[in-house]
Amino acid sequence: MPPTDRFVISFAAEPPQETLPYGRWADTLREHFLYACQEIETDDEEIGEPGEIAWFPDRTYAGRTYVPAVARTTEGYELFGFVSFSEGSGGPNDFEARADFTSEIADNNPDWKLDLNDDVIATWRGEQGKSADITLVWGVPLLAGGAIVTAELANLAVDQCELLDERFTLIAPDNYRSDFLEVKLWGKRGEEIAAESLYVEDDEDEDAVAGDAAVEAEE
């Protein structure tokens, strides 16, 4: 096999090792996640109280295990984030948690095919001084028939995760050499069902660019 021109970190995270959290373990994770939610800066926005937490498959990267979470609030916002920890001889320790909120939810976006959340957890240094954002991605498919989800960078698969209770978690490099992650949903027979970018283009920005181009053309 000849050398590749896409020298980038791939499949660096361990696949999920556990079932989705439940019982006392879920209670422990919930405590850390809710504490992170309390620390969110809302700029005086009333986001409400968190409801039931949906946990996502665990993934382990560079010695830390990440368990993402999502919860809807009483005001219709969505809390999203993760709890991470190290595995010591006595069990999980060194817990950390992050959380944020959004008003952009799947219920209000019928054109979405995948409901995605993401957070950068590390940096990978590549060739010629370039670096990639090691990104935790989690979500749910909004179309039926899926079995596995992949993360692709410039059409190169860099991670994958089988659906677990219709949920998935990925850890993959993003924003490397002007290439950006695309998340794809695949069926059991290997057929592509859906694809979504982590980046949503703003229609207003597109209109502004088009307007500027029109002005330049007139000049």
Residue ranges of each PLM-predicted region?
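N-terminal low-complexity, intrinsically disordered tails enriched in Ser/Pro/Gly
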Residues: 1-52
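Generic recognition of long tandem-repeat/solenoid scaffolds
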Residues: 67-69, 94-99, 137, 170, ...
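Short amphipathic beta-strand and strand-loop transition segments with alternating hydrophobic
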Residues: 48-60, 123-128
